[in-house]
């Protein structure tokens, strides 16, 4: 064997027990651990107090982490040719740490540790910190803009979890509206906020409008949107739009039909003051009553959600911008894939920003169906 690729997790697992059971391991571990202490200068440099310095014991979990780091460091110090020698004694590596004789630079150690296994930037940095402290080396920082493969993998997992939560939240709210709020009557004052919140939520989900834009629509406006797929209006004001006549688009039909059904039974419920925080309070109450728990829920997450799904299903960015009533595609870009998932299948997509990673459509799901007008 030529030694290429020998520094891997399988080889590490073979060496791990041998490193930890080596006669010198505990002694070197105690030395390396003690070198992790950061003694304040006012104690260390004081002739009086330095004599009475009390070394605070490390927590068991900290010692366990340190031991794991030292094992990986010793393994990474071994040259590849020696890794293939079952009789190798590791004295060279233990001497390096004990007597602070540098064999491998921090950067080279990073390289070798990345060959060993996929780790996060934080984990690698902590291990390098342990190494530089143990060897009395200058601080070594992994560059700020670096994102390791494991970080990307975990980021994708977190995005999937977040997207599952958002999808489930929207479906839960729609089911709550369809089963409970649809039957409510605005004659009861306590129910009005929920009815308002439900209508505005469905309009936002069906058109991509902002919360204060959505509450301006009438039942007649919804009829036109559902029938024709778009609505041109000179009475509905849109944020950051200079044009007097604005075009609204039907992006999702089912939520608009649900909004119309509730709105037709309560035609005056959205007649509230123009400058009021009521719509936002209604939105939060709707989520609470539906049993949806979200950290810092924001109404504009629906616009982000719709933009991403349109873009990922193949709709050009310029058209997505037009559907969102943005003046420029540059305004739409920050929306993309913030709350993204593949609506066409039960499996979440793995590429957060990969244009080619999700090309499915969502026509099979009533609550997620969308249509676009030209």
Swiss-Prot record:
Region feature (Disordered): 328-374
Keywords from the UniProt entry: DNA recombination, Transcription, Transcription regulation
InterPro entries: DNA_brk_join_enz, Integrase-like_cat_sf, Integrase_catalytic, Tyrosine_recombinase_XerCD
PANTHER family: PHAGE INTEGRASE-RELATED, PROPHAGE INTEGRASE INTD-RELATED
Organism taxonomic ancestry: Viruses, Viruses incertae sedis, Naldaviricetes, Lefavirales, Baculoviridae
Species name: Orgyia pseudotsugata multicapsid polyhedrosis virus
PROSITE patterns in UniProt: TYR_RECOMBINASE
Catalytic site positions: 210, 239, 303, 326, 335
Family per record: Belongs to the 'phage' integrase family.
Low complexity compositional bias, start-end: 357-367
An example Gene Ontology biological process: DNA integration
CDD domains according to UniProt: DNA_BRE_C (cd00397)
Domain Tyr recombinase: 169-349
Keyword Transcription regulation among UniProt keywords: yes
Source superkingdom: Viruses
Function summary: Involved in very late gene activation.
Name of the protein: Very late expression factor 1
Transmembrane regions listed in the UniProt entry: none
Pfam families noted in UniProt: Phage_integrase (PF00589)
GO MF terms, alphabetically ordered: DNA binding
């Amino acid at each position: 064997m030529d030694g290429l690729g020998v520094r891997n997790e399988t080889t590490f697992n073979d060496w791990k027990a041998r490193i930890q059971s080596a006669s010198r391991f505990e002694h070197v571990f105690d030395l390396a651990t003690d070198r992790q202490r950061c003694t304040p200068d006012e104690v260390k440099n004081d002739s009086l107090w330095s004599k009475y310095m009390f070394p605070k014991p490390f927590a068991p979990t900290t010692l366990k982490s340190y031991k794991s780091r030292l094992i990986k460091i010793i393994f990474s110090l071994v040259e590849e040719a020696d890794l293939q020698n079952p009789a190798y004694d590791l004295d060279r590596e233990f001497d390096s740490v004990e007597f602070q004789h540098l064999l491998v630079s921090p950067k080279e150690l990073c390289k070798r540790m990345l060959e060993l296994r996929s780790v996060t930037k934080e984990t690698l940095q902590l291990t390098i910190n342990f190494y530089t402290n143990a060897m009395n080396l200058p601080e070594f920082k992994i560059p700020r803009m670096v994102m390791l493969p494991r970080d990307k993998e975990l980021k994708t997992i977190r995005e999937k979890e977040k997207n599952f939560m958002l999808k489930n939240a929207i479906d839960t709210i729609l089911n709550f509206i369809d089963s409970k709020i649809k039957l409510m009557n605005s004659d009861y004052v306590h129910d009005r906020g929920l009815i308002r919140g439900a209508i505005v939520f469905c309009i936002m989900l069906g058109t991509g409008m902002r919360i204060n834009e959505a509450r301006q629509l009438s039942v007649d406006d919804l009829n036109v949107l559902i029938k024709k797929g778009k609505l041109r209006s000179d009475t509905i004001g849109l944020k950051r739009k200079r044009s007097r006549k604005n075009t609204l688009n039907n992006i999702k039909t089912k939520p608009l039909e649900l909004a119309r059904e509730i709105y037709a039974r309560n035609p005056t419920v959205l007649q509230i003051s123009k400058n009021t925080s009521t719509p936002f309070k209604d939105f939060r109450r709707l989520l609470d009553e539906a049993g949806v728990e979200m950290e810092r829920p924001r109404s504009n997450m629906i616009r982000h959600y719709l933009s991403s799904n349109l873009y990922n299903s193949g709709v050009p960015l310029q058209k997505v911008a037009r559907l969102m009533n943005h003046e420029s595609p540059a305004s739409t870009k920050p929306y993309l894939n913030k709350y993204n998932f593949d609506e066409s299948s039960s499996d979440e997509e793995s590429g957060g920003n990969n244009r080619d990673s999700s090309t499915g459509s969502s026509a099979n799901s009533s609550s997620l169906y969308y249509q676009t007008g030209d």
